Swiss-Prot record:
Subcellular location: Plastid, Chloroplast
Entry protein name: CDT1-like protein a, chloroplastic
InterPro entries: Cdt1, Cdt1_C, Cdt1_C_WH_dom_sf, CDT1_Gemini-bd-like, WH_DNA-bd_sf
Gene behind this protein: CDT1A
Compositionally skewed regions (Polar residues) per UniProt: 22-38, 288-302
UniProt function note: Member of the pre-replication complex. Component of the plastid division machinery. Promotes polyloidization and regulates endoreduplication. Involved in the coordination of cell and plastid division.
Subunit structure: Binds to ARC6.
Length: 571
């Protein structure tokens, strides 16, 4: 009974000894077979058991794992939080200073809108110049203006380029060039713009920067200086551009000149008329009756001279008129009319302006000449013989606005038979023949010939004939140009646009496109067997040249036509 119990207890105890590994169990056991205790079982090797014993401290419950994780977080968080707080503090402490400095710089560099737009135009100009250089295209105004408008979303004109050149004249170089226009197949003028960054003097600080950035800073600094010098917001002046692009604005001082002229006119209007004109003339009342009795001798007193006042002043004058400074001579007599008013007839009569106050030169001359024959009266003069009728008795004639007539004709106009007229002195009369008689014969004939040619040029038929002769005289030269051109390109059919373009581009003395087209029409008219025109399906006009025609024959034909046109002039 004991043996089986002991045998059963041995394996149990051996397990505990192996697991616990305590020395008390070794002293208590009295098993004579130690091999069963010392050797481990093959299912559970010793290394695995030792590793399990080492890992037993790690294998904890879920609660302990959570506590261990929490302790680790608490141990790690202060370091990270302190680092993060330091970084945040540094960034928060540095950002206000940076913001303040950036705000100050922005405030310093802030300009009014129109000056700011000019600065943007300059930056876009610099960028467009760089782009055109990378693309290999010429920096002409037509090329860079499109890029500037795309970058700034504003229209870039010649005036903006002139303003930029005024701010930075030494760095911007502008010259006139001729470029080929693909639409018109002609050469047209354009502006070639270049930026010379080496021509500008920089500060010591800006030498370390690139030339492009330094040039922009210099432009902006000069623009700011201009704004400070003109606080009222004046426009930036425009530098003159090469012709025909020099389209300057009207003079800004024109308004000042207009104001000055208007103020002068106001001053002239404020001056009394008595100071401006020294000879006021009193007007006589206009007759309103169909017939008026002649005044008696007691009613009329003739003054001896206009400067010498009469014994008694005039009793009644209807109005005083100050006449503008014209060559009218004052009347040498002054009449006194009684205070009794004239008898007004019941029939209405239209009153007319006195002829002596008309502004026509003929009228003024007539009244001045009519005023001459009146002489001072003496005691033997009969008052009834003196005509005291107002000037309305003169015949009213229609005033002509044609001033082309000679002064001799004007002197004979608008006089009545009842008023004697003094003859004008002969020394006042001057004619063209008398003036020309002083000149030499050759010069006189040359002047008359020029006058005759000027009259002929006014005739459209004569001017057209002269132009035709001039065109025909140039046809032999044009024939040689076209003949050599066709021989060089080896083409007998060419568009008219291309032909005209090649003629103008190859010869600097030929510049008028219209003149070349007229000469081509004359060539087709005179030598139709050599040149003709056809219209293609696309709508272009084709010029066809007959290669079988002899050049000598055509050239002689053109010279003969030229001689026929010049024959009437030689004869």
């Amino acid at each position: 009974m004991s043996t089986p119990g002991s045998s059963r207890s041995i394996p149990f105890k051996s397990k505990k000894r192996l697991v616990m590994d305590s020395p008390s169990s070794k002293s208590q056991t009295g098993n004579p077979n130690p091999s069963s205790v010392a050797l481990p079982t093959p299912e559970k090797p010793l290394e695995n058991m030792l590793s399990r014993s080492r890992n037993r401290s790690v294998a904890l419950s879920v609660k302990e794992i959570r506590q261990a994780a929490g302790s680790r977080r608490r141990s790690e968080d202060p370091v990270a939080s302190s680092a993060k707080s330091r970084l945040f503090f540094d960034s928060s402490s540095s950002s206000p200073s940076k913001r303040k400095s950036s705000n100050k710089n922005a405030e310093k560099e802030k300009l009014p809108e129109k000056y700011e737009n000019l600065g943007k135009f300059f930056e876009a100009l610099d960028n467009s110049m760089l782009l055109s250089k990378l693309r290999g295209s010429k920096p002409t105004f037509s090329n860079i203006s499109k890029q500037i408008e795309h970058l700034t979303e504003r229209r870039f004109c010649y005036s903006h380029l002139a303003q930029i050149k005024h701010i930075l004249p030494e760095a911007i170089e502008i010259k006139r060039v001729l470029i080929h226009d693909e639409t018109t197949c002609c050469m047209k003028p354009d502006l070639h713009v270049t930026l010379n960054a080496d021509a500008v003097e920089y500060n010591d600080k800006s030498k370390s920067e690139s030339k492009k950035i330094a040039l922009r800073k210099v432009f902006r600094a000069r623009l700011a200086d201009f704004v400070k010098a003109h606080p009222q917001g004046d426009e930036v002046p425009e530098e003159p551009l090469p012709e025909p692009f020099n389209r300057r604005k009207p003079v800004e001082n024109s308004n000042v000149e207009v104001k000055r002229v208007s103020s002068l006119m106001e001053e002239m209007a404020s001056i009394p008329a008595s100071k401006l004109f020294s000879s006021p003339i009193t007007s006589t009342p206009v007759k309103t009756t169909s017939s008026l009795a002649k005044p008696t001798s007691s009613q009329i007193n003739i003054a001896p001279t206009p400067t010498k006042p009469t014994s008694t002043p005039a009793k009644q004058t209807l109005s005083e008129i100050n006449i503008l400074p014209t060559p009218v001579k004052p009347v040498s007599t002054l009449a006194k009319f009684p205070s009794t008013p004239a008898i007004i007839d019941s029939t209405p009569v239209i009153t007319a302006t006195p002829p002596e106050f008309a502004s026509t030169p003929a009228r003024l001359m007539s009244t001045s000449l009519a005023a001459r024959p009146l002489k001072r009266s003496n005691g033997h003069t009969n008052p009834d013989d003196i005509s005291a009728d107002p000037p309305t008795k003169l015949v009213r004639r229609s005033l002509s606005l044609n001033f082309d007539s000679y002064p001799e004709d004007e002197r004979t106009m608008d006089f009545t038979d009842d008023i004697p007229i003094d003859q004008v002195p002969e020394e006042d009369v001057s004619s063209d023949d008398e003036i020309l008689s002083i000149l030499p014969d050759k010069l006189r004939h040359a002047i008359k010939e020029q006058e005759r040619k000027a009259i002929e040029d006014q005739n459209p038929a004569i001017s057209l004939a002269k132009r035709r002769r001039k065109m025909i005289a140039c046809l032999p030269k044009l024939f040689n140009v076209i003949h050599y051109l066709i021989q060089s390109i080896r083409r007998w059919v060419i568009t008219k646009e291309e032909l005209v373009h090649k003629i103008i581009a190859g010869h600097s003395d030929i510049t008028d496109r219209k003149e070349v087209e007229e000469q081509l029409i004359l060539l087709q008219e005179i030598v139709p067997e050599w040149m003709s025109e056809k219209k293609s399906s696309s709508g272009d006009v084709l010029v066809c040249i007959n290669k079988l025609a002899s050049p000598l024959t055509i050239r002689s034909r053109l010279e003969e036509e030229n001689k026929q046109e010049m024959a009437p002039l030689l004869s």
